[in-house]
Amino acid sequence: MRNTSKYYLVDASVLPKVFIKVVEAKRILASGAIKNVNEAVRKVGISRSAYYKYKDHIFPFYETSQGKVITLFFTVEDYAGILSSIINRIADSKANIITINQNIPINGLADVTITIETGQMTRDIKDLLDDISSIEGVKRQEILARE
């Protein structure tokens, strides 16, 4: 017999507080701020049994419609610190970096893809790309995908 799960998207304001506290305890544990379940449940104010009862059944919903998810592609020269410079420009614009992938340099050039969430960005994506293109060693850039 198959156990099929059903999922519902529910506004947090109507959920029993225990669910919100379980999610908060999971977040605290995942961040490493607290190392064990006892301390985490004590901090958020729930019992261990409530935590264990719900921990595998409640998850936060990350709203990607708040901001678009954009995948950027760069070809960069093999300079020490060039990836760090690109990441710093993205961070300065308050974009949320989701993934970074850098290939091994071949003939002095490396391909880099960075996926960002733009919901909290403080400037236009075009301005960000113009800023990144001014970094010495950035040879090519493009937007690969938008969601």
Swiss-Prot record:
Q: Which SUPFAM superfamilies match?
A: ACT-like
Q: Give the ACT domain ranges.
A: 71-146
| InterPro entries in UniProt | ACT-like_dom_sf, ACT_dom, UPF0735_ACT_dom-cont
Q: List the disulfide bonds.
A: none
Q: CDD domains attached here?
A: ACT_PheB-BS
Q: Which family does it belong to?
A: Belongs to the UPF0735 family.
Name by which UniProt lists this protein:
UPF0735 ACT domain-containing protein Cthe_1377
Q: Which organism is it from?
A: Acetivibrio thermocellus (strain ATCC 27405 / DSM 1237 / JCM 9322 / NBRC 103400 / NCIMB 10682 / NRRL B-4536 / VPI 7372) (Clostridium thermocellum)
